[in-house]
């Protein structure tokens, strides 16, 4: 199963094995670790999301809310690990100028100042230092495999807290020796990427700073350990993802009233649109006892709406929360590709005759568009200005190519017309943009309707040849997301279709039309 946007698209009839207890426990432990630390995050910037209701309805117990949140957390984490090959835990430093960051620095500095004062006192006070070594011992032991081994016994022997307390009573604790042993042990069990940190620790001369840096590196080592676990369990999670995610979501639905409200509304919009369309085409169908809708067609139309979704203002259906960041990124890339295709179409229509036979020029113009349209989905981006710049540079490149061939350059009127038409692409309902939108939607719809046995890509509609390679890559990523979503949530969609259509005789057709595994 390609989970990270490979060229091969996921087919809808892909099977999933049953959930195993080892997998569930592994995901739960990862989720618990992530919640308890609260300092790690995913590099894909995925946010934990909950169903649309912002406050629990009356009668919903707090325990139910927490249970649903736990299931959502486990499900989201498992999904992210499975579909995102780059997923890893990483330290999330507080903003330097934030209140929380300042409070943290002040409190930590106060602790280390007290420790330094205690160790410098006559006689030295070891209470805080002993607590630190006790915590260090537990962290080191957590890196080792369960069961007895020589290193485990050695750590317990050297960092024997009872013995250290006895030594402290006689002011005979070798703090430097204990710290050196800890650093040596860390060097034996850390990942190679931490070797430089270990060398820096060994070069530190101030004992308090050394202890401070030991904890910093131990935190990094714990992060490395969790990422190692994630890499190793990823194939297992991928193998069981469909069944596991479906079962977890079922628990959320059972624990949370109206857990599918946004999903129901999402499907209802497409059903109403299809029914209205059928009535317009064949008014007699209005009196038919059974809707002639294809649930799979309606569902595909729902997925297509996600390509033009307002991710800043509209809430996603609950069944798509885990893929929200991926869908938003895909939609933004597709929007930029559409604008590139629009620019190429207008340019070709206006000056194509004089630039025919210059493929390198077409590639240069495409690169110019890609560079100047970078970041066009940001609110601060000035699209009109970018399109004007593209028009000016396009004219310059075309004139340069014509001069090299000894041909007349574009006159001022043609150049002004070209720049003006390109600048008008930012206007709402621009006919060229509308046309390209329809063709991209047609291409994506064709991808979703591909038989599972077909491995080749559908033909690219006219005008999209300039972005064919990029469109195929995004199309496969989109199809992978959609087909996995159908496998996981097919039974939930079928139940919603039943309720919306109120047709008992249609139930069998609906069940047969939607993938459930």
Curated annotation (Swiss-Prot):
InterPro entries, A to Z: Tcp11
> What species was this sequence derived from?
Mus musculus
What's this protein's family per the entry? Answer: Belongs to the TCP11 family.
In its UniProt entry, what is this protein called? Answer: T-complex protein 11-like protein 2
Q: Which Pfam families match?
A: Tcp11
Q: Where in the sequence is Phosphoserine found?
A: 16
Which key words tag this protein in UniProt? Cytoplasm, Cytoskeleton, Phosphoprotein
An example of a Gene Ontology cellular component annotation for this protein is: cytoskeleton
Ranges for the region named Disordered are 1-59
Q: How does it assemble?
A: Interacts with FMNL2; this interaction promotes muscle-derived satellite cell (MDSC) migration and differentiation.
* Role according to the record: Promotes the migration of muscle-derived satellite cells (MDSCs) during differentiation throught interaction with FMNL2 and therefore may participate in microfilament assembly.
Its gene is Tcp11l2
Q: What is its main location?
A: cytoplasm
